[in-house]
Amino acid sequence: MLKLLSEIGPVIAFFAGFFYGGGIQNATLYMLITSIICITLCYIIDKKVSKLSIISSTVLFISGIITLISGDSMYIKIKPTILYVIFGIIFLMSGIKKNPFIKYALESIVRLKEESWIILSYRTAAFFFFMAVVNEVVWRNFSDETWVKFKVFGVIPITFIFILLQLPLLLKNKLPDSKI
């Protein structure tokens, strides 16, 4: 639950900051503060922070600080694209190398045949590359307000749909001692 809150909390803070706090600059500041709090809480409670969270936070801090200093919202808008491309490369390369990164993230929930982890890695890579393109299209062609709404009401449902579409693979290829 804490991990979910640490991922969603900064997005909610960004959304609230944009609509109730006065635009992208304030939203970026709120998101940075919330992210610092969430990472700190995760570390205090779990004594660790995941590699993906470290990558996400690093890109967020760099793009967020540049946005705040420069006053140019482009930097916070390209943050998702940068993250999606990085994650896409990680999942693609781990599939190619037959050492699927996604296995380490999900193995405590589901145990799969090795070839299924590789398929899931490729699918996840494709999903992240797709999301990078979608983010670029939305931020470059629509208003700030539309982009912010898309971040909450578009990305989350699209991600949920992607996860649901993976269920047949997971259920068909799970090992007998799997939790799902």
Swiss-Prot record:
Phylogenetic placement of the source organism: Bacteria, Pseudomonadati, Pseudomonadota, Alphaproteobacteria, Rickettsiales
Leader sequence segment: none
Originating organism: Rickettsia prowazekii (strain Madrid E)
Cellular component terms (Gene Ontology): plasma membrane
UniProt-listed NCBIfam families: ispZ, PRK00259.1-1
Keywords of this entry: Cell inner membrane, Cell membrane, Membrane, Transmembrane, Transmembrane helix
Transmembrane segments annotated in the record for this chain: 25-45, 49-69, 76-96, 118-138, 150-170
Name of the protein in its database record: Inner membrane-spanning protein YciB
Main localization (coarse): membrane
InterPro entries: YciB
Family the UniProt entry places it in: Belongs to the YciB family.
Superkingdom of origin organism: Bacteria
Places the protein is found: Cell inner membrane
Membrane topology: Multi-pass membrane protein
Its biological purpose: Plays a role in cell envelope biogenesis, maintenance of cell envelope integrity and membrane homeostasis.
Pfam families per record: IspA
Transmembrane among keywords: yes
